[in-house]
Every structure is written in structure tokens, then in C-alpha cells.
């Protein structure tokens, strides 16, 4: 598409979806700020149909060879209360992409000093935002790095102590009133969208939002709108239309335009080799087990313990006993893949013994909740080992979310990752990604599990070829619901006696 050209797509029941491109530069600014990812939303797809959309705590996207691919970055601009967030939610729901990060520009405000009256402060001026922080945040997310996102409170007009942690994504969406203002920020965007909504509609929405959600009075909202919001919209926001690739009239009410926009984003993703409809699929036919996947020798003793663990009638006490026994053997096997050096010692008889000693610091990462089942066997083998924990749980769509992480000092350490089952591999991938983001090289990670699905463990191997995997059994089947077959059921529930 040539510079400053415009293309319109019209439908019978909706205003046009306008596509434009331009190479004009924007004015530059400097400021300071904060940021927050949008949290989980219940998004209405159709009347009576609600889909929960998760937009935080996701690891970055890798191709089938384990290489990090740049995510698709989308900038959504528009006036205050134009429906930007609603449009983003509908796009996310329609895309059905596995991992999305949705960032709001509202979080990138400066702290307001006590001397400033919020009702007299222009929150719609470019100088109210920290574009340097926005550029840094988007750049690091594009590189697959972990970023800490501060939160901004509109009641106190300051940053909160708590920060959210974000781990990259397939798609990164930044929405706000002035997302297209900074040229440096625009250069990081693959798609630039402008939401064009009638002034009266935006004012009505702003009144409702600021009074109900931000503790403002009617008079203060109207004063701020007439004094700052409307003039800033005319002076700074409307001119940004010329930078947009796509203009969506009527905002979130324009369903046809949103559907066309979604299809356009799908095409952009497919151009990068990513098909949302074929996420994480592997061709397992003819594949040999890679050298980094180790299955402990299947002796009669191992088969007997696995039979007890797989048996649905096994009592809790027996399950715990044989789980601890089997995990001890698996962990012992995993320790053999650590680096050792020769050591000569003198025995009580005065003779010399040529032995080995561990040549590395080791620690462990317990993937809660099920990984806690392996912690006691680990401590019985590795005296005084330092352990960290991550809590990763899947939603009803079997997508993992990181809720908690606490790691010891992993510098120059080999790390044992403990999780008794590997099903789809999604939660395990996130656990490994946490370690990589803390500077642990792939070749210093050993993933220890009891039972893995063939698809799940191969999925992980292709993404992290230098990670070692040690298991006692690999089951070839995985149900449509993501359960290992034959498997052993919910491992943590059976170990802890919960339902």
C-alpha cells in the first residue's frame, strides 16, 4: 500500500472500515509513568454467549525448532471512552490465540504530586505519559523478556506497590488515547488502529466510568472534559488518524468492522508462520526419541510401582509411599546428568580411592501444586538443597497462568524442575521459561517427571532442545481434554487425598 493512501471496505449493515498508511512523523515528548496489563475479562461474543478472556501471565511464542519469534504488536488509539478496550477484548475473543498481552496506556501516567489538583490536571496531554517506559516495555516483550508492570491508581493518582509480571506473548496489544503519538513507539507496532466514536457517545461513557469507577463527581468530570479532554482530543488525538493503518468507525458497536479487522490480524499472524487454528501441533509419526529425553530402565520393580500408581483403587497411603519410592529413583537418575569431576580420597585402610564429586551448585524448582509431591524424595536425596516454587494453573480452556513465583539464587546453578506429569506441556513450558528469564541456560535445566505424554514431552523438546528430561514412563496418547492416557489421574489430588 502506498504512502497516504486510503482503502475503504463497506458492508450493507455497517459503516466502513477505513485503512490508511502514512509516513508523517509525530512530535516527540518526554515524561515518566507506570503500566498494567489488563486482567481477565468476561467478553460477550454474541447475545447470551460469554467467553472468559485471559490476558496476563503468558510465556512467549516459539517456533517448532525452539526459536523465539517476534510477537505481533498492535497499537489501538482513540479518544477517551471510545471503546478501545472493548474492541480489544472482542478481537482477542475472535482470534482465539493462545497467548495475548493487553496493556493499557492509562497505566503509564506520572505520579501526581500532592500540589496538583486532579480536577485541574490535564491527563489527556502527551506530557502526562512516559513514552520512554512504554518503548522499553514493548521492546522487551518483543524480545521475549520478562517485564514487571506497575499499577496506577486513579483514586490516589499514584503507582501502587504491587507489580504484575508479564512473560511475552503471541500478540501484544497496547491501547490508549495517544498510543500513536510517539514515532519510536509507532515503529515497534505491526498494526496501528484508530477507534473513531462520536463525541457525545464518548462523553456519556466517560461520565459513567469516572463517577462509578474512579470516585469523581459529575461537576469535576464535566469541568475536566471541557477544559482538557475535548481540547486535547482536537489538538493531539484526532491528528493521529493519519498514522493509523485501520480506522474503525463507531468503535465496539461496529461488529462487521471488528470481524474484518480480526481476519486481517489472522493473515498477519499466518505471514509469520503462526496459524492460531493449529497451535502447538506436532507430527509425531516417524520421530525417534531425542537424546535429551531419558526414560529410566523399566525393571519389574518400576513396572510394579507404576501399576500401583495407575490403579484407580490404590489408597492414599499406598499412593504416597510408592510415589515417594519411584520419585527417589527418578531423581537419582536425573542427578547422573549433572557435571562431576574426579576426586581421590583416602580410605580408613590407607588406600586411595578414585571417585567423583559434584562439580556444580544445584537447586530445584517445584511446580505447584503437583510438584510438591516430589519435594520430600528430593530432600531425602539432596541434603540442604535450595528450592523455589512457581504456582501454575490452567483455566477451563487448559491454558496455563502463572500466579506465583519465588526462586532462590539460581546464578551458576543447575536446576531440577519437579512436576510429576507432563500432559500438553503448556505448564511445563511456562516453568522452563521462568528459569530462562532468570538467566538459567537451557543446558543447566533438568526436568524431572513421573509420567509424560509423548506429544507433551516432544513439544517441550522441540522448544528447549538443550533441556534434559528424565521420566519413568511415556504414554503415547493424550485425550482431547488434555489428559494423559492411560496416565494416573490427577496426581496431586491422589497424593494429598483431595478431590
From Swiss-Prot:
Keyword terms, alphabetized: ATP-binding, Kinase, Nucleotide-binding, Transferase
Entry's Gene Ontology BP terms: CTP salvage; pyrimidine-containing compound salvage; UMP salvage
Listed CDD domains: PRTases_typeI (cd06223), UMPK (cd02023)
Regions crossing the membrane: none
Binding residues for ATP: 78-85
EC nos: 2.7.1.48
Gene3D superfamilies assigned to the protein according to its UniProt record, in alphabetical order: 3.40.50.2020, P-loop containing nucleotide triphosphate hydrolases
Role of this protein: Catalyzes the conversion of uridine into uridine monophosphate and cytidine into cytidine monophosphate in the pyrimidine salvage pathway.
The protein, known as: Uridine-cytidine kinase A
Organism: Dictyostelium discoideum
